[in-house]
C-alpha cells in the first residue's frame, strides 16, 4: 500500500493546532522537523523545545489521495502556514530501510561498533554489539566517539568506572571490553536503563555492569554499596554537566580520571570554570572533520581529580 504525506510549514506557536487538525483529518503519524537551520543544543529533562519555524508532516493512507489537496489548502489557512505541499510515499520495508543506514564503525585502537544484526568485519578486534534504536549513544555521534577514543587510550585494567548519563550504555560496555573491572551506569531515562541492560547482555558483560536511575544510584553509593570510581565518563550536555560538577567530585578517587562530552566550543570556558575547583581539565580535543560531516564544533574535556 502506498501513502500520502501532507507537509505544513508554520510558526512554532501554531504547531499544537496544526497537530490537532492533522489528527482530526485522520493522520496516522505526525513528524516535526526544523524548517531552517536552527540548532537546539540544550534540552533539559522534561523540556521539548521547538524551532521557530517547523515543518509538520502528516502521514495518510492512499485512499485520501483525492481529498488531500483540498485538505492541504484548508489546513494551511487555519494554521497560517507559510508553505503547504503534498507528496506520495511508496510502501517499503521500513525496518530494513532503517537498518540500511547503520554500518560497522571503526574507532581508534582496534575498537569497533557493530550493529547487532551484522557480523563484525574484524572478529579479532574489540567489537561492541549495539542496538542503535534504543537510546542515545550508538557511536554514530561525535560526542560518543570522542569519549570512546579517550577510553581506548586509558589503562582500564582492574578499574572501576562510573558512566553518568549512560544512554545506550556504550561507554561502560566499551570500558569493560577494554579491561575495566566494574561499571556503574546511571541515567535519568528509564528507557536508557533498559537499553543499557539489553546491550550489556548482548555483549556478555552483565556480570560486571550495574545500571541505576539517579536516585537509586545515590542511595546505593551513600550506603557504601558502590565504591568511588577510578574513572568517570559523562557524555551529556553543558547545563546538566555544570550542575553535576560538585556531585561528580564526590564520586571519584584521588587522582581519578574524568572525561566530559556533549560540549560545543562556546561552552568550554564556562565548563572548565565549573570543574576547576576539583579537576584539572585538558581542553584541546575536538572531533575531527571527516569527508561526510564537519563535527569539529563538538569537544570533550578530560583530566584528573585534584580535590
UniProtKB/Swiss-Prot annotation:
Q: Where in the cell is it found?
A: Cytoplasm
Q: Does the keyword Nucleus apply?
A: no
Q: Which GO terms describe its molecular function?
A: protein-lysine N-methyltransferase activity
What are its E.C. numbers?
A: 2.1.1.-
Among Pfam families, the record links this protein to: PrmA (PF06325)
Reaction(s) this enzyme catalyzes, per UniProt: L-lysyl-[protein] + 3 S-adenosyl-L-methionine = N(6),N(6),N(6)-trimethyl-L-lysyl-[protein] + 3 S-adenosyl-L-homocysteine + 3 H(+)
Task: Give the CC-aspect GO terms.
Answer: cytosol
What is its EC class?
transferase
Q: Which UniProt keywords apply?
A: Cytoplasm, Methyltransferase, S-adenosyl-L-methionine, Transferase
Q: What processes does the entry annotate via GO biological process terms?
A: methylation
| Listed InterPro entries | Ribosomal_L11_MeTrfase_PrmA, Ribosomal_PrmA_MeTrfase, SAM-dependent_MTases_sf
Where is S-adenosyl-L-methionine annotated to bind?
Answer: 144, 165, 187, 235
Q: Which family does it belong to?
A: Belongs to the methyltransferase superfamily. PrmA family.
List the NCBIfam families. Answer: prmA (TIGR00406)
Provide the function of this protein: Methylates ribosomal protein L11.
**Annotated protein name in UniProt:** Ribosomal protein L11 methyltransferase
Q: What is the species listed in this Swiss-Prot or TrEMBL entry?
A: Psychrobacter sp. (strain PRwf-1)
Amino acid at each position: 500500500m502506498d501513502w500520502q504525506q501532507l507537509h505544513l510549514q508554520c510558526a512554532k506557536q501554531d504547531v499544537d493546532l496544526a497537530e490537532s487538525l492533522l489528527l482530526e483529518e485522520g493522520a496516522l503519524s505526525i513528524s516535526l522537523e526544523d524548517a531552517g537551520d536552527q540548532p537546539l543544543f540544550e534540552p533539559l529533562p522534561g523540556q521539548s523545545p521547538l524551532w521557530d519555524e517547523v515543518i509538520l508532516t502528516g502521514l495518510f493512507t492512499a485512499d485520501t489521495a483525492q481529498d488531500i489537496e483540498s485538505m492541504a489548502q484548508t489546513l494551511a489557512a487555519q494554521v497560517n502556514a507559510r508553505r503547504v505541499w503534498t507528496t506520495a510515499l511508496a510502501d517499503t520495508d521500513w525496518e530494513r530501510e532503517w537498518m540500511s543506514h547503520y554500518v560497522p564503525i571503526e574507532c581508534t585502537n582496534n575498537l569497533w561498533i557493530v550493529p547487532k544484526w551484522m557480523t563484525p568485519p574484524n572478529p579479532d578486534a574489540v567489537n561492541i554489539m549495539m542496538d542503535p534504536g534504543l537510546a542515545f549513544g550508538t557511536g554514530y555521534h561525535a560526542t560518543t566517539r570522542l569519549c570512546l577514543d579517550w577510553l581506548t587510550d586509558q589503562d582500564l585494567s582492574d578499574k572501576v568506572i562510573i558512566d553518568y548519563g549512560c544512554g545506550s550504555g556504550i561507554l561502560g560496555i566499551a570500558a569493560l571490553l577494554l579491561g575495566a573491572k566494574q561499571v556503574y551506569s546511571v541515567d535519568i531515562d528509564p528507557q536508557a536503563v533498559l537499553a543499557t541492560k539489553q546491550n550489556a547482555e548482548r555483549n556478555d558483560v552483565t556480570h560486571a555492569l550495574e545500571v541505576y536511575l539517579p536516585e537509586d544510584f545515590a542511595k546505593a553509593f551513600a550506603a557504601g554499596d558502590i565504591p568511588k570510581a577510578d574513572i568517570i565518563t559523562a557524555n551529556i550536555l553543558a547545563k546538566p554537566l555544570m550542575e553535576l560538577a560538585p556531585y561528580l567530585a564526590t564520586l571519584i578517587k584521588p587522582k581519578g580520571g574524568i572525561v566530559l562530552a556533549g560540549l560545543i566550543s562556546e561552552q568550554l570556558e564556562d565548563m572548565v570554570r565549573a570543574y576547576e575547583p576539583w579537576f584539572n581539565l585538558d581542553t584541546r580535543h575536538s572531533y575531527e572533520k571527516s569527508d561526510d560531516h564537519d563535527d569539529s564544533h563538538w569537544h570533550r574535556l578530560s583530566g584528573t581529580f585534584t580535590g
